[in-house]
């Protein structure tokens, strides 16, 4: 819902801080910029989508997303979808906008992600990488895709390139293999 305050139009904005495991370098505390889609969902089952937005997160992991169909004071789950990471949800109970602003940081504490479904790199928490086929789990099917593309020296903006060096190789396979071994899956309400 777009609010009007003394003639000024206030579009609800979510200021999001998030990091993706394969793209984050804890030594430089920088990440590679990439596109992310964020859904705001009802906090009651079946968790219907209320609104969505797309943005690019910057090298610090920050993204600012404008929404049209949300209201202040109503709790929403924040559901983050990235091209090659496990989809993540905000903590149990949801979050609400106040004065058309919601600031949310997934990186400082694992409790900010539903089911604590993040991995710690350095001092920050990141979404797990490796779900290249977006089936909700890092598993053999993801490893097969990465392995096949690595063996053909695939280059470019590919879901299989987990560290975004524009080359699918053993570095990407290692990240996915570790997460498959640990049975990493989406944890949602």
Predicted region positions:
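Short coil-to-beta strand junction motifs in C2/discoidin
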Residues: 28-37, 73
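Short amphipathic, basic-aromatic surface patches that mediate peripheral association
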Residues: 11-31
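Short, acidic Ser/Thr/Gly-rich low-complexity loop/linker segments typical of extracellular
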Residues: 44-62
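Structured interaction patches on ligand/partner-binding surfaces of diverse proteins
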Residues: 1, 56-57, 85-117
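Short Pro-Gly-centered beta-turn/loop motif in secreted/extracellular proteins
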Residues: 61-76, 84
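Alpha-helical segments with a strong preference for the paired helices of cellulosomal dockerin domains
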Residues: 110, 114-119, 132-159, 163-189
């Amino acid at each position: 819902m777009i609010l009007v305050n003394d003639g000024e139009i206030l579009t609800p904005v979510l200021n999001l801080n998030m990091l993706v495991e394969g793209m984050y370098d804890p030594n430089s505390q920088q990440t590679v910029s990439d596109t992310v889609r964020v859904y705001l969902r009802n906090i009651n089952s079946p968790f219907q989508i209320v609104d969505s937005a797309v943005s690019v997160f910057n090298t610090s992991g920050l993204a600012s997303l404008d929404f049209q169909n949300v209201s202040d004071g109503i709790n929403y789950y924040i559901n983050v979808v990235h091209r090659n990471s496990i989809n993540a949800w905000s903590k149990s109970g949801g979050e609400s906008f106040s004065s058309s602003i919601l600031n949310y940081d997934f990186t400082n504490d694992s409790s900010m992600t539903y089911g604590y479904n993040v991995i710690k790199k350095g001092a920050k928490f990141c979404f797990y990488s490796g779900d290249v086929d977006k089936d909700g789990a890092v598993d053999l099917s993801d490893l097969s895709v990465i392995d096949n593309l690595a063996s053909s020296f695939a280059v470019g903006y590919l879901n299989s390139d987990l560290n975004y060096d524009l080359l699918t190789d053993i570095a990407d396979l290692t990240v996915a293999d570790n997460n498959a071994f640990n049975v990493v899956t989406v944890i949602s309400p």
